[in-house]
Amino acid sequence: MIGFTFGFGSILIVLSAILIASSIRIFQRGEEGSGRTIARFARRYAERTGDAAFPSALQALFDEEARHANDLGRFIDLAGISRLRNEFSDGVFRFMRHRTGLDGALCLLVTAESIACIYYRALRAATSSPLLRELCAQILRDETQHVRFQSQRIALLRGSLPAPVSAARRAAHIVLFAGAAMVVALRHRRVLAAGLGPRRFFRLCRVEWRVVDRLVMGDDAGRPTRHPASHA
């Protein structure tokens, strides 16, 4: 957890001045979750391949996600705004994860985290609150590592697949990524307009997709990065 001193006044300025309370609540809900489904897929994968380090590295990632959710939750709690118990887009992602294997679940996860990187950049640019800016910066640092870790793992999973199957999964991932970007652009337009603007948002989405695609398809994808938190 980040060692913030939460100032109630600065929180109210941020949330009331740029009307982003509902947006932050949605992303806070999205950061929550134990990752039980992907953890189950990861354990099965480890049993099948002997990669015993993967489940613990993945759990370290989810521990960081829980910290993000906790910090964002404290932020909105002190502003006197209720947290969301259920949220439509988060529910859709969870539903889809339960009905895929490890590859599909990681594609959903890396899509959400890649686009979240752009959202937190917009949120950081949209506010003058040092507290919120620092929180966004910390989440961005973590999410960037998560995206690389997940993308490289997808590369390993697809390495032994026939070329047509791998190409079909890549095409499905492109559709998923584009659809998720459209949803975020519509639902979080106030934050994006204040911090980036819609054109720059979609331009950055294309950049993020190229990063993921290069890691999945590139030469360095076969050398997976251990998640930094798993070293501790």
Q: Could you describe each region identified by the protein language model?
A:
Residues 1-232:
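Non-heme di-metal
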